[in-house]
């Protein structure tokens, strides 16, 4: 049996608080934390619409880069460097030109710090990205890091991907709080981000000083923003949106993410998605940089790749050429033009060379890039023979192109070849900002700020809370409703009886107070040594649920490392949105809420009785009344055991007040004010 332990209550009284003179509006915030660029959108409750938080220069996006400025010697600071993120960081790099203290594309290194195969994962990153990453050991634990150093021969400081992301997020936060108060926050991640990558994103946000954010999937955010606009502009209704299946094709600077988003019954679901953590515009930049570096070496003998500063300058130049070329081709009829873009590049002192790029050469250099896009799409639509069963593309109503790299003409051609040009919807869709806008709307949705006709429930999150049975029939949630899939959660418990030899972990999904009223999943048993008093064992229970509804349950005795585990299937994964909605109505219904309140009163009375039964309380009761006091406590316990399930809440509240008054009489001459001991929940 699982039973809650004694929890101390802390009361804080605020007196004479000053009047709030902060006139900034409280807003719902959405952040698209991108590999190359990030964007901030806020939903204003007063205007009932979103707006973007612009940079000081008026841009809607911010470079996801960090430049470490060297501090003056002898200033007493722990670090020799100061982090400068976003546009100021990029401008400082352009002015000072030190590539060894300039960092970009670090999103690809997020969330691999705690992996057992960390060395193998880092090698994969090195193969797929031109970012100087390595593994170091800190306190006996391996972690991913980058080197900050003035020159290759100097000593270095290290910085983690999470720390770099936190610098970007802190810069974004500074921009937000200039004009707004943060009422709630959503940060988007690729649909295929795993639990570790999600946790790393949350960690970076908290390091930046944000409240713990909601984490949401980028394709869902884009689809939400799109359907919201259709409803708001009167182009369609919420009911008509229910028949809409959207393919979100999100090709950004560092990641490729493609998802099918279905709407049904007011729910937004992601039944199928795919992606590649190492495919995006940065790969195109890599290909162009290598091509022109080889050209410069063969023409002049100068090796650009041996000089990090020159290499990074070349990379910036070819990125500009890429954009100019793609703009020219997109403007041409049928995107069939083969323009030529030329730029002069200074590579060695004052020496310069003219670089030229045609669309034909551009596509030739990126043939493998296009092939990998097609392969991902084929896997998504045709299936991979494993968990992904494929998706009938004829069911897709429209395709949204999201991310800056969808401006590459050949990428547009590929999408049109797959779905047909008539299904690509671009009117009013800003590929750079739609994800952030959707994130802000989702935050507003979670805060109940949207009109009823605009609200959408997403089902790419846990639809009903997942938990275990405690206190004989209490449902204790371990993974809460709304958690991003895949999701995991762990809570620690202890035993309810002396010399307990095993504990049974019963798992259900729902959220109703009474465990038996929820949807039963399964159970496991964990063996214990059996020679320990109640409250001594430490038992960690972990629940995990993946995007396909598979549930993993594990219980570990932390004192001897014994464990039990098993896999189950979620019945909820096969429920219709209407069935889930009806269950949610029961969770928020009057009957369940009354039971929650009643159980809380029962819990308080149980805690008071347990406290009165403890040796500490027996010691302070005078001998002449000790027998009467202990009999009174025992009588109250017997009453509670008999009536806690059948008596109404008001009767238990009366008994709690009666017991409290009775104990005060017994202890009126004894010492008082002993603090309750905080304990773990009990198994």
Curated annotation (Swiss-Prot):
<dbReference type="Pfam" id="PF00012">
    <property type="entry name" value="HSP70"/>
</dbReference>
<protein>
    <recommendedName>
        <fullName>Heat shock protein ECU02_0100</fullName>
    </recommendedName>
</protein>
<dbReference type="GO" id="GO:0006412">
    <property type="term" value="P:translation"/>
</dbReference>
<dbReference type="GO" id="GO:0005524">
    <property type="term" value="F:ATP binding"/>
</dbReference>
<dbReference type="InterPro" id="IPR013126">
    <property type="entry name" value="Hsp_70_fam"/>
</dbReference>
<comment type="similarity">
    <text>Belongs to the heat shock protein 70 family.</text>
</comment>
<keyword id="KW-0067">ATP-binding</keyword>
<dbReference type="InterPro" id="IPR029047">
    <property type="entry name" value="HSP70_peptide-bd_sf"/>
</dbReference>
<keyword id="KW-0648">Protein biosynthesis</keyword>
<dbReference type="InterPro" id="IPR018181">
    <property type="entry name" value="Heat_shock_70_CS"/>
</dbReference>
<dbReference type="GO" id="GO:0005737">
    <property type="term" value="C:cytoplasm"/>
</dbReference>
<keyword id="KW-0547">Nucleotide-binding</keyword>
<keyword id="KW-0346">Stress response</keyword>
<keyword id="KW-0963">Cytoplasm</keyword>
<dbReference type="InterPro" id="IPR043129">
    <property type="entry name" value="ATPase_NBD"/>
</dbReference>
<dbReference type="GO" id="GO:0140662">
    <property type="term" value="F:ATP-dependent protein folding chaperone"/>
</dbReference>
